[in-house]
Amino acid sequence: IDENIENSLGQYVEGVPEHYCRVHGQIYALPVTPSVQILYYRKDLFESPICKRTYFEQFHEELQPPKTFEEYNRIAAFFTRDLTPSSPVPYGSTITLGSTGVAGSEFLARLFAIQENLYGADGQIHLDSLQCQQALAELVQLRRCTSPEYCGWWTQTARRFAEGNFAMSILYSNYASDLSSHSSHVVGNVGYSMMPGNNPVLGGGSLGVSKYCKRPKDALSFIKWMCSEPLCSASALLGSTSPCRRTYDN
């Protein structure tokens, strides 16, 4: 449609075009809301001298953001009042299970913490592998550390975490704005960290032109407008995540 489309990629944050624009080197789309899973936690709880001392006495380890999902579940249990009566909050972690696709995101977060991607050494997906079994087991174990009224979508998860009843939450970055909203009870007390395993699931989305489009040039013109400044900065102010470098330089 546009042989100069490559020129549109220079405005984006480093790394975004590779994940949101190209497939096997070919440009198929432009990024509109790039995002990534981030671990958010109650900084006031993790830095509490009482919580830190109690955790150390119980597990002989420092209380800090978890590096593995085994640690994540242990900390979640520590902050779940039904399991630890002295916990200052009712639940250790949120969980988002609204549909097969949403629940799959929780599963993949745990799988990617122990293997690079979905595929085994033979290039096939093996859901009965030991790694997949471990990821599923870690997800099932977390159910006892969260509210029985699980969240259906990440906006709901962010609102629930903002109520102040959870110690940790895994959210996509473009859904986290409610943590600092006027109604949030955790403003100033939210820390953030890389996901356990340092291999988070990417989220967000890109826009491309369908091959069935009757007016592809007009469609591409609209997409370029949607995926560039000043619109991306305006979207960021409304809680979205911008793909453009200029947003973060302002």
Task: Cite the ranges covered by each PLM segment.
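Pocket-flanking alpha-helical
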Residues: 9-29, 70-88, 176-183
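Short helix-loop capping/hinge motifs at secondary-structure junctions, enriched
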Residues: 45-56, 144, 212-219
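Paired acidic/hydrophobic, glycine-rich loop segments that form the ligand-binding mouth/hinge
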Residues: 167-172
